[in-house]
């Protein structure tokens, strides 16, 4: 058994690096909260790679906080197994902007178009007081 590991362990390590693809992404945007304009300051924003395979969890690609005007820029890299399998990025935004109807605050998840560097994903205005079920 130990001989097997000695001979084949380097192969498995090498093949994992060869068969995975690393991609990096940058996303920018401006957070808006019409119900409380001050709530766009220092908002926690995570960039995640969704892994839908069984026994895999999503990977944190990057993290940032918005500035006092709600501007943010988040960058990160992720690797997915397979030469044609690219990361599936999304933003997870934890905020304190009250919903325009109910005053509740819920985190927002936004799928990001997988445009990898050198391209930049420009999200424009991201309204924190509206949710998908509003539309």
Curated annotation (Swiss-Prot):
Coarse class of the protein's main subcellular location: secreted
GO biological process: aminophospholipid transport; apoptotic process involved in development; recognition of apoptotic cell
Effect recorded for residue 101 to A: Partial loss of ability to recognize apoptotic cells. Partial rescue of the engulfment defect of the deletion mutant tm2078. Retains phosphatidylserine binding specificity
GO annotations of cellular component type: cell surface; extracellular vesicle
Gene Ontology molecular function: any one: protein homodimerization activity
Gene ablation phenotype (knockout): Loses ability to bind apoptotic cells and results in reduced ability of cell corpse engulfment.
UniProt-listed Pfam families: TTR-52 (PF01060)
Keywords: Apoptosis, Secreted, Signal
Subcellular location: Secreted; Cell surface
Signal sequence interval, chain numbering: 1-20
Required for mediating binding of apoptotic cells by ced-1: annotated span: 131-135
Tissue distribution of the protein: Expressed in the intestine cells.
Top-level lineage group: Eukaryota
Effect of residue 65 to Q: Monomeric with defective clustering of ced-1 around apoptotic cells in the embryos of the deletion mutant tm2078
Subunit structure: Homodimer. Interacts with ced-1. Interacts with nrf-5.
Family to which the UniProt record says this protein belongs: Belongs to the nematode transthyretin-like family.
Function: Plays a role as a bridging molecule that mediates recognition and engulfment of apoptotic cells by cross-linking the surface-exposed phosphatidylserine with the extracellular domain of the phagocyte receptor ced-1. Important for the generation of extracellular phosphatidylserine vesicles that promote loss of the exoplasmic leaflet from apoptotic cells in a time-dependent manner. Required for the exposure of exoplasmic leaflet on the phagocytic cells surrounding the apoptotic cells. Does not affect the phosphatidylserine externalization in living cells.
Name of this chain's protein: Transthyretin-like protein 52
Gene this chain is encoded by: ttr-52
